[in-house]
Curated annotation (Swiss-Prot):
Phylogenetic classification of the source organism: Bacteria, Pseudomonadati, Pseudomonadota, Alphaproteobacteria, Acetobacterales
SUPFAM superfamilies according to UniProt: Glu-tRNAGln amidotransferase C subunit
Reactions mediated catalytically: L-glutamyl-tRNA(Gln) + L-glutamine + ATP + H2O = L-glutaminyl-tRNA(Gln) + L-glutamate + ADP + phosphate + H(+); L-aspartyl-tRNA(Asn) + L-glutamine + ATP + H2O = L-asparaginyl-tRNA(Asn) + L-glutamate + ADP + phosphate + 2 H(+)
Keywords per UniProt: ATP-binding, Ligase, Nucleotide-binding, Protein biosynthesis
UniProt source species: Gluconobacter oxydans (strain 621H)
Name of the protein described by the UniProt record: Aspartyl/glutamyl-tRNA(Asn/Gln) amidotransferase subunit C
A GO term, aspect molecular function: glutaminyl-tRNA synthase (glutamine-hydrolyzing) activity
Entries under NCBIfam families matching the protein: gatC
Subunit structure: Heterotrimer of A, B and C subunits.
Pfam families in UniProt: GatC
């Protein structure tokens, strides 16, 4: 299956993806093959198979929570449009 140029362009616009005209045909074929694959999955007999949202076997590795200053204050402050010492300077919004 291959999607027509109008459909590909519409999907790209909805996804906010900029496409060059020469990409439309290739992308249409790629999207079509994905749709064909999903159609094949619909044909699989899953009778008697319980729905599953995860294996439940894997335990996530957690790191120890430690509060740090990041050790990069000067690097962060270098992005400030204005600063006074080690602080950002922002316009006054409340009088």
């Amino acid at each position: 299956m291959s999607l027509d140029a109008k459909t590909v362009t519409r999907i790209a616009r909805l996804a906010r993806i900029g496409l060059q005209p020469e990409e439309i045909e290739t992308l249409g074929k790629d999207m079509g093959s994905i749709i064909d694959w999903v159609e094949q999955l619909k044909e699989v007999d899953v009778t008697g198979v319980d729905p599953m949202i995860g294996t439940g076997l894997a335990k996530p590795r957690l790191r120890e929570d430690r509060v740090t200053d990041g050790n990069c204050r000067d690097k962060v402050l270098s992005n400030a449009p204005e600063r006074e010492g080690p602080f950002y300077t922002v316009p006054k919004v409340v009088e």
